[in-house]
């Protein structure tokens, strides 16, 4: 598993958590087919746990930069992609362009073309430090 796959798996965990699941060990390893202890599975776990720990601040950033979209209105898959990406932008000290590109790759696989454009706009606004 590479980092993009780790992001996709983290997005799935965040989505499952949002839909009422617990993102527990069974989901993380058995259902996703991820092996514990691998560098990327550790990264996936760090992303998931970081998003959950910082969910309020992450959602505030998304809501502020989503140009008229409330958190409740955003598609749940798109929201999961955004949450993981915003966590990476804020806490992982990775280049913003790389984080955004990888997040768009995940969105392209799991969401719609319009969603990719929306996610790109929100993440670009956040990366530039702008407000809606």
Report residues per predicted region.
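N-terminal interaction/assembly modules
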Residues: 1-116, 120-132
């Amino acid at each position: 598993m590479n980092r993009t796959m780790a992001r996709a798996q983290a997005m799935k965990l965040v989505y499952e958590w949002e839909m009422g699941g617990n993102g527990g060990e069974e989901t993380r390893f058995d259902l996703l087919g991820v092996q514990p202890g691998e560098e990327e599975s550790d990264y996936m776990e760090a992303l998931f746990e970081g998003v959950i720990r910082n969910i309020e601040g992450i959602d505030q950033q998304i809501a502020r930069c989503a140009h008229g979209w409330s958190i409740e209105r955003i598609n749940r898959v798109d929201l999961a992609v955004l949450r993981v990406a915003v966590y990476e932008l804020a806490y992982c000290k990775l280049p913003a362009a790389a984080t955004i590109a990888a997040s768009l790759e995940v969105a392209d696989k799991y969401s719609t073309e319009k969603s990719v454009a929306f996610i790109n706009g929100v993440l670009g606004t956040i990366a530039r430090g702008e407000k809606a």
